[in-house]
Amino acid sequence: MALNEIVNLTVPSLPAYVSVVRLTVSAMASRCGFDIESIEDIKVAITEAVTNAVVHTRGNSSSKINIESSFNYLSKQLTIKIEDQGPGFDSSHIKIPDISKLQSGGLGLFIIRSLMDEVNLDTTVGQGTCIVMMKKLGGK
């Protein structure tokens, strides 16, 4: 058996493809032995990340979203990398949301970080965004 399983997916930056990515990654997580609660967390995080990519590329069908999901059997870790071709943004402005002043939008990254074991964000204005999310089999 290989030490890593890798699934690569490139989809148009359209809302209809959010579910395709979610189903693909959740099927991989199930195959690798994640429990239902962890799979649901992964599905919510994927939905948030891919929806953000679609929104920030303005649903431009010529723009693509690249997804790489990999599971390492030694570290027992699922890693999901999502890259878009959007405008990027200045990540220094990201703040912890004030729950008492909730508004529509702005919670995606907060939700992703609360559900996944590790999250790394690489974004530069004018160069798109890459988010890498990790979930360990059996929790932290």
Question: Would you name each region that the model predicts?
Answer:
Residues 29, 47-50, 86:
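Residue-level detector of secondary-structure transition/capping positions
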Residues 1-8, 53-140:
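Conserved beta-strand-loop-beta-strand hairpin that lines the nucleotide-binding pocket
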Residues 1-44:
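Bergerat-fold GHKL ATPase/HATPase_c domain
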Residues 36-61:
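Conserved ATP-binding N-box helix of the HATPase_c
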